[in-house]
Amino acid sequence: MFDHKAPGMRVDLPATALAFTDLHNDFLSQSGKAYPLIEESLKKNNTADNIERLLRAAKAVGMHVFLSPHYYYPHDHQWTQPLTPLEDLAHKIGLLDRKGAFTLEGLEGSGADFPERYKPYLTDGKTIVTSPHKGYSTSTNDVILQLRRYRIEKIILAGPVGNLCVEAHLRDFIEQGFEIAMVRDATAGTTNEEGDGYQAALVNWRFMAHALWTTAEAIRLIKASANSEQRNVAA
């Protein structure tokens, strides 16, 4: 059995950021197309509320917040290469669909839009909303570049689909040299005939992440980092 202690992660401002994947209605709102797939896990973890708590805490101390969204445009539905099972489902049900890359027509209130409760945090002119990822990982958007440009070295990571986009981002971030702390109750997952995706994510994160926190632990450390930064400035 693997019982080696994780190294942990110190939260340092301004080198630490809070990052999310997929904060969309289709995952987090009851009317969302994928909501039924992860509903049980979302409710058990209190995921939607915990995401807002993290956003509020980060904004209160001036921590950088990054969001890696996921959108599909009409040209994405013209792909000819075979899709993965989840991509195939997404295309069939219109998950995260937008009218196009250069228009906001139909976005407001749609499945691709942000939940209203998060908009004060995500549209404040300070949150870094990257270009959309098209698969699961960071390989199809600019989130790595954006993190580098802001001199981010450590990431507190969360999002609604823990065993897919969140974990894919985790793996990429680690291989790009970032330190990562995962927030275990600010995420969720679905099940299939092979087992529980959320539990599978936790198992993998325990092997890979530098730290695995609850939302309460993450908020405590975020607040403590701000106090430490203030003391350093005063000194």
Describe each region flagged by the PLM.
Residues M1-A17, D26-F27, A60-V61, Q78, ...:
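Active-site-adjacent betaalpha module
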Residues P14-T16, G32-A58, G62-P69:
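A short alpha/beta connector and helix-capping loop motif
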Residues T21-D22:
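N-terminal nucleotide-binding beta1-loop-alpha1 segment
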Residues S68-Y71, P160-V161:
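Short, well-ordered beta-to-alpha junction loops that form the rim of enzyme active sites
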Residues Y73-H77:
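Short catalytic/ligand-binding loop motif for oxyanion handling, primarily in non-cytosolic enzymes
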